[in-house]
Amino acid sequence: MNLHEYQAKQIFAQYGLPVSEGCACQSLEEAIQAVKKLGGGQWVAKCQVHAGGRGKAGGVKLVKSEEEVRSFFEKFLGQRLVTFQTDAKGQPVNAIYMEACANVKKELYLGAVLDRSSQRIVFMVSTEGGVNIEEVAEKTPHLLHKMPIDPLVGAMPYQGRELAFKLGLQGKQIQQFAQIFCQLGKMFVEKDLSLLEINPLVILDNDQLHCLDAKIVVDGNALYRQPELNAMRDPSQEDAREAAAEQWHLNYVALEGNIGCMVNGAGLAMGTMDIVKLHGGQPANFLDVGGGTTKERVAEAFKIILSDQSVKAILVNIFGGIVRCDLIAEGIVAAVNEVGVSVPVVVRLEGNNAPLGREILAQSGLNIIAATSLTDAAVQVVNAAEGK
């Protein structure tokens, strides 16, 4: 689960990390009051969306008067911001963070991620702050320094000092960086994070380190024990179909194709998407209904797929092991009757109670295309999506 920048900075402040004073504003009136409270002659206005690349998209701007604040709010508040990390629709801007301006001498990068291969939290630093860190890793990997954390002892000051040396920090900056590093390590564990990022971590004109940006991603599997963070969830930033699928314990990821896919098992779902693409089709989604599904969940899965207006055909690929094919068939029939499907539906059933499942579909009187194999299913659904 992603947090907004202003929410992440609230967490940073709880751990004593240096962040700028600011206010998340949901109206122009709140923004005018915020800049008066912050004081100074200039501020930074930041659109709050769950996506990077805000600056390049115009969603972060230095404003020097109340009139410029007004202009920024009229342009972005209530609109959708499109960045290189969003789809063509962009993300809704429901709040704009007004922040005190900082005098920056140098920009650095500091981040941490849960590395599943090494089963450790890994910190990363670079002297190339304020830019896309993926580009740094690809083009100049020698400028990206990593530090794995022993889970038994956590982030240690000596590790922070070692990274500080690699960043070229001097004097009191080294001690300050070590403190920031240790607090971030503590935060990562206590808050069940999967990623945190400060890009940029800056050196101010007074030579102090400062967290100019803040990004936090919380492990969704741990939200049950993080009520404070769970309360910060912003459903408006999530795909409505993915949110609906989560309520029914369905694994759904929206894509940009026109062939809806409903499969049981993540591996089979990925294989199904591959074979659809192999035959010239474009999947509209990844959807794994799971091994212990019910006909009600199948019906909801159908509704979620059909809520995507770009879907021109649907492929149902079920290998019955734990899940029975007759239950899937009953769910398909119920969903088609309830929703009223106007697009072709191709179904391939194999395994547990597959003959019974096929019989249920055949006797339903619905216009369902039966496939004899996975290859046949892929060919038929691609042709159906193309209107052949």
From Swiss-Prot:
Organism, scientific name: Mannheimia succiniciproducens (strain KCTC 0769BP / MBEL55E)
Binding site for ATP: 46, 53-55, 99, 102, 107
Molecular function terms, GO-annotated: ATP binding; magnesium ion binding; succinate-CoA ligase (ADP-forming) activity; succinate-CoA ligase (GDP-forming) activity
Pathway linked to the protein: Carbohydrate metabolism; tricarboxylic acid cycle; succinate from succinyl-CoA (ligase route): step 1/1
Enzyme class: ligase
Catalytic activity: succinate + ATP + CoA = succinyl-CoA + ADP + phosphate; GTP + succinate + CoA = succinyl-CoA + GDP + phosphate
Needed co-factor(s): Mg(2+)
Residues that, per the record, bind substrate: 264, 321-323
Domain ATP-grasp stretches: 9-244
Enzyme Commission code: 6.2.1.5
Function per UniProt: Succinyl-CoA synthetase functions in the citric acid cycle (TCA), coupling the hydrolysis of succinyl-CoA to the synthesis of either ATP or GTP and thus represents the only step of substrate-level phosphorylation in the TCA. The beta subunit provides nucleotide specificity of the enzyme and binds the substrate succinate, while the binding sites for coenzyme A and phosphate are found in the alpha subunit.
InterPro entries xref list: ATP-grasp_succ-CoA_synth-type, ATP_grasp_subdomain_1, Succ-CoA_synthase_bsu_CS, SUCC_ACL_C, Succ_CoA_ligase-like_bsu, Succinyl-CoA_synth-like
Subunit structure: Heterotetramer of two alpha and two beta subunits.
Family statement drawn from the similarity comment of this UniProt entry: Belongs to the succinate/malate CoA ligase beta subunit family.
Cofactor: how bound: Binds 1 Mg(2+) ion per subunit.
GO annotation terms (biological process): succinyl-CoA metabolic process; tricarboxylic acid cycle
Protein name: Succinate--CoA ligase [ADP-forming] subunit beta
Organism domain of life: Bacteria
Keyword Ligase: yes
GO CC annotation terms, alphabetical: cytosol; succinate-CoA ligase complex
Keyword terms, alphabetized: ATP-binding, Ligase, Magnesium, Metal-binding, Nucleotide-binding, Tricarboxylic acid cycle
